[in-house]
């Protein structure tokens, strides 16, 4: 029996759980249930990520303390997770005494080991709010392309990265005030100290998906930098030891919350467990983190480095999921597809969504699409039309004609045994997180069971004199096949599994219990197990999501100081731009590129991520600020012109290796495309 600790990425205590969040939590819960069904000792913990400026400001806007803010949100999160059957053994908060102690311990051990540096940095300071501003609370004009309304770290139009102090016409998004530069001592974690260690760690077998390890190579090639782990007061979080008015950056104590949540679980519920058995350096137990692909950088670089520096064990593996789209597009409040967990639960059975997600998920880091029409069709066809239908077709005969008791003989031992044997490959698929493969195999078995019943036609046999035993045998085989399917689906559909277990009056419903065929076994009266998805309920859920947005928009808002208006600079007219010589122009290497792939960028309303064939051995990754004007599918297969010798730019979404040329006049943007006949890699001159 393996001993395993599983965690999920911590939801931020600043808002509700929505469909995009649930993809990763349902994936982890299914895996935990499957591993337990195979007989392993699995502990599953999580917590709210409860620190940071955003929470402090949200509490201020709501007129409550940060402590009250995070307590309220935590109860909402617990309610929503419970509603979807995501059953944590313990759900904590990073704002706990245990997390404070553990965070200080890891920091002090790293400080003692020489992994902490202190040096002054110059930041932008809001004179009205009397606080330093992080990049997300600063907007201004890009110093490179002069695009307005850009954040303090990178331009989403031209892709340039910069320091917030380089922004033109900067303004605080909190007060509208013009920030001033101010110096402050900050604390840094020396990540470069762990460069060689991390390069090996990220390539350890089973540690990371290969695609993620390949992506991290870009960071190693660019060179790791010291990580700023401090924030200045005012800030809601833990104060750094021996550093008054300096606080741990939220991404320091957030992953440490995995440890403190487990620690609190031991104290509250399982004192027989030992914390060190899971977290000491030489621990043989397993620790896995289920996370979204947007937070890989923190979990695959900073987190293992901090643990290594403090002499703790590192995670056995990171299981990474992609993003969720709805109907093929980014979730949208205006379209009603930005669906909160609470809204879904008011309209639909949560097990519908668990099944649909499972049918889509694999061990690959791929985005998943919740197509609402396909959702209705798949659930109704698979769960109601195939699986539940087997019990419905057979149980009525057992209940009405055979005193609720199955036949003492198995009429189809080879057929039933084939279902039992299939459990091995299904279990392997679950363990490998190949849920879609497991579902496909289970549904193939369901088809086989229905085919058997269709061929034997117990309803017709029941009308023939002297065929009672045959009816009894056929329906008993059908119930045994149904039981196997329900066991295999139990990690995905725990509520349905509990109902089936009660209906079949079984003490155990784990994978091992499937080996025993039910003979002369008494069952309960059959009750309907699952209703069909009503398309009207889906439509009502979408409408309610629109309604909740409208209600939010119309709700009274806290008064804010009017932002200072920044005058928009007109684009220079033809002939007014700075004159350059031919020696400057010929430095620019313009090449024809073919768009192989195009995708939206999570967290950006302006960027598209393009994979470009430039006639080189490997394709180029380029971020382009054209999302408002092009759909990804419009660009795939299109020839464009790019600047091929632009220095790589590290952005918060990844590294951009070039710039796609486009024309614009304020009313739109048009990507420049060569005539047909041009080939990827051709030089433009």
UniProtKB/Swiss-Prot annotation:
Pfam families: Anticodon_3, tRNA-synt_1g, tRNA_bind. ATP binds at residue 333. Residues 584-685 form the tRNA-binding domain. It catalyses: tRNA(Met) + L-methionine + ATP = L-methionyl-tRNA(Met) + AMP + diphosphate. Its EC number is 6.1.1.10. CDD domains: Anticodon_Ia_Met, MetRS_core, tRNA_bind_EcMetRS_like. Belongs to the class-I aminoacyl-tRNA synthetase family. MetG type 1 subfamily. This is Methionine--tRNA ligase. It comes from Acinetobacter baylyi (strain ATCC 33305 / BD413 / ADP1).
């Amino acid at each position: 029996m393996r001993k395993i600790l599983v965690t999920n990425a911590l939801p931020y205590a600043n808002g509700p759980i929505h469909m995009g969040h649930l993809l990763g939590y349902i994936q982890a819960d299914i895996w935990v249930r499957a591993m337990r069904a195979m007989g392993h000792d699995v502990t599953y913990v999580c917590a709210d990520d409860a620190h940071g400026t955003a929470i402090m400001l949200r509490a201020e806007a709501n007129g409550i303390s940060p402590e009250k803010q995070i307590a309220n949100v935590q109860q909402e999160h617990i309610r929503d997770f419970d509603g979807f059957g995501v059953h944590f053994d313990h759900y904590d908060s990073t704002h706990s005494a245990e997390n404070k102690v553990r965070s200080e311990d890891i920091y002090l051990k790293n400080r003692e080991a020489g992994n902490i540096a202190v040096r002054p940095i110059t930041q932008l300071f809001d004179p009205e709010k009397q606080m330093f501003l992080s990049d997300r609370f600063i907007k201004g004009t890009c110093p490179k392309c002069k695009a307005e309304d850009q954040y303090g770290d990178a331009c989403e139009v031209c892709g340039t990265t910069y320091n917030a102090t380089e922004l033109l016409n900067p303004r605080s998004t909190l007060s509208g005030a013009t920030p001033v530069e101010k110096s402050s001592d900050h604390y840094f974690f020396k990540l470069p100290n762990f460069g060689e260690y991390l390069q090996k760690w990220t390539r350890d077998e089973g540690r990371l998906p290969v695609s993620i390890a390949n992506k991290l190579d870009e960071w190693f090639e660019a060179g790791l930098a010291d990580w700023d782990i401090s924030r200045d007061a005012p800030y809601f979080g833990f104060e750094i030891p021996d550093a008054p008015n300096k606080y741990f950056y939220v991404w320091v104590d957030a992953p440490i919350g995995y440890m403190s949540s487990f620690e609190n679980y031991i104290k509250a519920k399982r004192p027989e467990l030992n914390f060190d058995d899971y977290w000491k350096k030489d621990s043989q137990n397993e620790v896995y983190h289920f996370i979204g692909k947007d937070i890989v950088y923190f979990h695959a670089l900073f987190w293992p480095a901090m643990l290594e520096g403090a002499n703790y064990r590192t995670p056995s593996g990171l299981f990474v999921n992609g993003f969720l789209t709805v109907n093929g597009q980014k979730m949208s409040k205006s379209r009603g597809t930005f669906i909160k967990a609470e809204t879904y639960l008011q309209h639909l059975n949560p097990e519908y969504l668990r099944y649909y997600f499972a049918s889509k998920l694999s061990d690959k880091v791929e985005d998943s699409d919740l197509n609402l029409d396909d959702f209705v069709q798949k659930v109704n066809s698979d769960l109601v039309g195939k699986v539940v239908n087997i019990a419905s077709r057979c149980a009525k005969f057992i209940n009405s004609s055979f005193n609720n008791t199955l036949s003492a003989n198995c009429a189809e031992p080879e057929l039933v045994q084939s279902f039992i044997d299939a459990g091995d490959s299904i279990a392997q698929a679950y363990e490998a997180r190949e849920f879609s493969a497991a579902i496909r195999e289970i549904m193939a078995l369901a088809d086989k069971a229905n085919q058997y019943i269709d061929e034997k036609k117990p309803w017709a046999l029941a009308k023939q004199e002297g065929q009672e035993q045959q009816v009894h045998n056929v329906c008993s085989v059908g119930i045994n096949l149904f039981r196997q399917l329900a066991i295999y689906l139990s990690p995905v559909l725990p509520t349905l599994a509990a109902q089936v277990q009660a209906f079949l009056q079984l003490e155990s419903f784990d994978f091992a219990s499937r080996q025993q065929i039910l003979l002369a076994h008494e069952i309960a009266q059959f009750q309907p197990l699952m209703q069909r998805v009503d398309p009207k309920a889906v439509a009502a859920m979408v409408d309610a999501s629109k309604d909740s947005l409208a209600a939010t928009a119309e709700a009274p808002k806290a008064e804010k100081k009017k932002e200072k208006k920044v005058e928009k600079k007109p684009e220079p007219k033809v002939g007014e731009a700075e004159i350059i010589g031919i020696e400057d122009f010929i430095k620019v290497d313009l090449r024809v590129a073919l768009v192989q792939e195009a995708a939206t960028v999570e967290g950006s309303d302006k960027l598209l991520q393009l994979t470009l064939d430039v006639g080189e051995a490997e394709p180029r990754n380029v971020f382009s600020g054209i999302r408002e004007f092009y759909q990804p599918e419009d660009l795939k297969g299109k020839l464009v012109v790019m600047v091929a010798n632009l220095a790589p730019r590290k952005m918060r979404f990844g590294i951009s290796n070039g710039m796609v040329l486009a024309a614009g006049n304020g009313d739109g943007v048009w990507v420049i495309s060569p005539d047909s006949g041009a080939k990827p890699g051709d030089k433009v001159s």
